[in-house]
Amino acid sequence: MGRSLTCPFGISPACGAQASWSIFGVGTAEVPGTHSHSNQAAAMPHIPEDEEPPGEPQAAQTQDSPSAGPFPSPPTIVLTGDASSPEGETDKNLVNRAPSPHRRLSHRHLKVSTASLTSVDPSGHVIDLVNDQLPDISISEEDKKKNLALLEEAKLVSERFLTRRGRKSRSSLGDSPSAVSPNLSSGASPASSRSCSLTISTSPGLDICSGPQSPLPGAPPQQKGHEDGVSSPCPGEPNVSKGLADLKQNDQRKVSQGRLAPRSPTVEKTKELTVEQKENFDPLQHVEATPMAQASGASISGKMALNSPQPGPAEMELGRQLLKTAREGNPLPRTTAQGSGGTVSPHSLGQGSAGEPMGPKAGSKAELRSPVSRPPLIRGVSWDSSPEEPGPLLQKVLAKLPLAEEEKRFPGKAKPAKPPGLKDFQIQVQPVRMQKLTKLREEHILMRNQNLVGFKLPELSEAAEQDKGVSPELAPAAEEEESKSGLDVMPNISDILLRKLRVHKSLTGSAPPLTEKEVENVFVQLSLAFRNDSYTLESRINQAERERNLTEENTEKELENFKASITSSANIWYHCEHRETYQKLLEDIAVLHRLAARLSSRAEVVGAVRQEKRMSKATEVMMQYVENLKRTYEKDHAELMEFKKLANQNSSRSCGPSEDGVPRTARSMSLTMGKNMPRRRVSVAVVPKFNALNLPGQAPSSSPMPSLPALSESSNGKSSISVSPALPALLENGKTNAEANCEVGAPVPLPSCLEETSQETKAKAEEEAYSKGYQEGVKKTEELQDLKEEEEEEQKTESPEEPEEVEETQEDEKDQGSSKLEELVHFLQVMYPKLCQHWQVIWMMAAVMLVLSVVLGLYSSYNSCTEEADGPPGRSTCSAAQRDSWWSSGLQQELPAEQ
């Protein structure tokens, strides 16, 4: 007998199937339904990609009909201990195996070689892993700890995978298109919802060891279909009870975790009966049900709730009453327990009644209704919505089907009616806590269906994208939270910033319009935001492209998986109508693929246009700021030109001709005719009071106005022009209006400015030369006066007899000489103003002339004395003092006149 070991990680469904057959002692090659894969790899088992997540083992699944479709098996590892079994038992199983008109195990996950799995032991012997005795494997404690750690890690990863965003819950039995297993929980992967297998487990009270009995030759196919799923007792198999106990423990763990709702035994029996009828119906023959089918159906039981007792006689009687009610045309309603796991099709319960003819279309009605009436676009709506409360979109789709076509496809369809008291009975069976959880889950499903049906696609905005799929009702709250917390990925120039700056609308239409100061502040903030965005632009582009590519890849994977699931269930579409529906589903998948690509591109275009809208608003603010600057510059430039004209007029007036018509410079006007003309030395640059010309928000150093030269006096007597680059320098003449002698342009000086500058420089040089020569002349005059005083003192000592006359004569000569000298100097200054530049030469010439005059005076006085000595003796001769002094010549000429 084989040993069944339950492992928390998944294994191939085919391996599970081989293990289940090996329990009965049947070789893998002898199992019917697996002969079509004998040429594939025999060395290694095939482990499917879409296996069940760890931590959720289920019962081993046996697939008895191609209409149910493939479904991944629970994660079990079977090590065959004793492969030898009696030949009689093997032959019995093979004989009792009901033949199936269609190919079995068609899913790609079940493509496993039927040859014996072999391996090599350390000694070199080849071991058949299925039929031979396997050696004992000793695992150390350290390896066990590692295995446990790996299992825990796998469980955590599975939980994260199941709860990640965008994954739908596992669909239920009645909601899936191909009647998936009724024991699916809400926490499983969507891969399970795509498969179409049916899981039928038994309670410990029923043995399913032996295969079904061969049908009688005269038995109708309906009875044969029921006997396919009926297990005859087979005593002497202790491992079956062990496996069922493990299944009970697993189901108890699921119920405790809230992933599996307990089920009523009576409802499960009716459900299993209808599923068996649906699976084993032969569409090629018209059958009539017999009482034998009812008897065989009474022995079938599905999974039972682990917290409910074994069905007793009273419950069996209640189940028979329910079956009778279903046969009379009242379908079983969807209960609260089935709401969490699945629903039973109401039309599949009336197939096995005794004495009623059932047509092929009526038998396949439950299979056909789901894929035909539910397009793939509303998969999330139709699979999870209850029949009592369908969404508006589902009602629309169902209403589109013509009534005549429905009557043609489904003859004898009866309107569903609820049997009284049935739902109350089901609620009483369930615990109170499970009732609350089931009700809460139904409310969540209803809310999700309303969101999917009642709204369009979510608004494409960065705020909704960053909040990771917030529902449309929570979008305003999400924007408020986003504005409070700040954006991590979003650029600084967002709708929130534009709304804060009051520029989310156009400036022309904004009430009230922004002032120049507000426009300047907005411009400063926008320029700062642009600069900050430039630092993170590359990283944000890479992140957005990566997220877009990931979303597109996920969408393509989902569509490919959905297409693979539809393709794998091609063997159940055996009617022409079914084939048309199958082709339509494939076309819908292709359309969805194209629509997903188009949606991605259109969303990208919408985002680009919205960003362009933001940038246009920011650019409008910047253009408004530039226009304000231009207007201010033109105003200031006009004022500057006006001041320039005034300065030129004042300069020409101050340098114009005088009243007498003679052009005079500043030096000549200061010395002519003793007039006190206003004279000012151009040496210091005066800062004008033009602060109003400075632009708002700019420093005086950044003023765009051209500056004027500032004339300063140098220490070496020459002049230098210093140009102030920041502020214009204008001249003041003591009056209210300012005088500007010249202006130097910023790029290139004008020729008129150069001429005015040269004239001012010449006038200044003349004035400096005049002042210097005048001071030297005063010094020379003082020296001459000192010299005269010394001579007078000497004369006094030499001629003491005539001191008074000598003093008077000297005073007269001094007065006459000083007056004549002053007149001469003034005359020379008036007539020859340029001679003032050569005062040193003039004074040297004057000194030479003075020396010559003294020499000539002495010579003339000597000659006069010698002539008088040669004259008559009666006349007096010259004294020694007269002969020595040159000024006595005048007296000698006056004495003969007096005599």
UniProtKB/Swiss-Prot annotation:
Its main location: membrane. This is Inositol 1,4,5-triphosphate receptor associated 1. Phosphorylated by PRKG1/cGKI. Keywords: Coiled coil, Cytoplasm, Membrane, Phosphoprotein, Sarcoplasmic reticulum, Transmembrane, Transmembrane helix. GO terms for biological process: cGMP-mediated signaling; negative regulation of smooth muscle contraction; relaxation of vascular associated smooth muscle. Disruption phenotype: Mice lacking coiled-coil region N-terminal part exhibit disruption of IRAG1-ITPR1 interaction. They have dilated gastrointestinal tract and disturbed gastrointestinal motility. Smooth muscle are no more relaxed by cGMP after phenilephrine-induced contraction and half of the homozygous mice dies before the age of 6 months. Nitric oxide (NO) and cGMP-mediated inhibition of collagen-induced platelet aggregation is strongly suppressed in platelets of these transgenic mice. growth. Highly expressed in smooth muscle such as aorta, colon and uterus. Detected in the brain, in the thalamus, in the hippocampus and myenteric plexus. Highly expressed in megakaryocytes. Down-regulated during macrophage differentiation. The gene is Irag1. The modification Phosphoserine is found at S106, S382, S670, S683. Residues 171-180, 333-351, 876-892 have a biased composition (Polar residues). Residues 521-567 are annotated as: Interaction with ITPR1. Residues 140-172 are annotated as: Interaction with PRKG1. Residues 181-203, 699-715 have a biased composition (Low complexity).
